[in-house]
């Protein structure tokens, strides 16, 4: 992915301009429907990934591959973005079923991992900029995206409900979603 970004195959510049619009429009993707906070969290994770990748490439260029810890944090953000997007899509496709468990799982997962994305991004930006030297535009975007990534979800309460439903079912109800 880094190679494709460096060669211009992925269009990072175009996506970054979309991220600028996203951040200047109140960090709202325009999504309407169930699980809006989760959808916005996922979009914010993609945006923060693009900004972190761009700033990493600006600092390290083609030597970015040598920065293993930085690459690990970038990968963690990307893995969350993909897994959460895929999970939410499956839940929305099967939303007509009476089972609320998948929806609860996606709410807990996205809320819990969104907080981790903020931590990963903060580590990346702290390695690129001195804590007091982060450019104002990057800091403003980070602060806006942080609000979308940090959901006001009762993760513990949701996990209790998931546990209770699992016990009621006599184990994890394994279904193909």
Pin down the residues of each PLM region.
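Flavin-dependent oxidoreductase catalytic core characteristic
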Residues: 1-177
